[in-house]
């Protein structure tokens, strides 16, 4: 499952792209997507999680959707990343039972990356207490 700005380099990631085994779910977002629009679109991710019932959750934690990031033109705040992480963990808890790994992927404004990563980790820690 991927939420990302589209169209954007390298040109892949449209809704129509499903992968060789029909197991790719892209949620493309236009440049300028606001936090509310992003969070509403993210409900599709949460619904797919409920449907799939994963036993393991791997966060590919990219923070280039932050409003201050120079790469993408999405408009999330550090607090929005906390909300996304928390909601994902809440939805997946019955299936994953705490089997969660997070890998840092992107974020190119160092201050925004630090703040967003911290809020993501805050949600992970709270989830595991």
Q: Which role does the model predict for each range below?
A:
Residues 56, 101-102:
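Beta-strand segments within the central parallel beta-sheet cores of soluble alpha/beta enzyme folds
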Residues 92-100:
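A short helix->loop->beta-strand "cap" motif at the edges of active sites that frequently abuts
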């Amino acid at each position: 499952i991927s939420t990302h700005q589209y169209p954007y380099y390298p040109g892949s990631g449209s809704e129509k792209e499903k992968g060789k085994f029909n197991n790719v779910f892209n949620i493309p977002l236009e440049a300028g997507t606001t936090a509310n629009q992003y969070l509403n679109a993210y409900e599709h991710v949460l619904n797919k999680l409920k449907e799939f019932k994963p036993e393991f959750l791997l966060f590919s934690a990219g923070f280039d959707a932050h409003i201050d990031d120079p790469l993408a033109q999405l408009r999330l705040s550090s607090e929005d990343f906390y909300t996304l992480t928390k909601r994902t963990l809440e939805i997946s808890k019955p299936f994953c039972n705490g089997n969660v790994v997070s890998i840092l992927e992107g974020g190119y404004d160092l201050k925004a990356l630090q703040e967003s990563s911290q809020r993501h980790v805050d949600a992970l820690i709270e989830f595991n207490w």
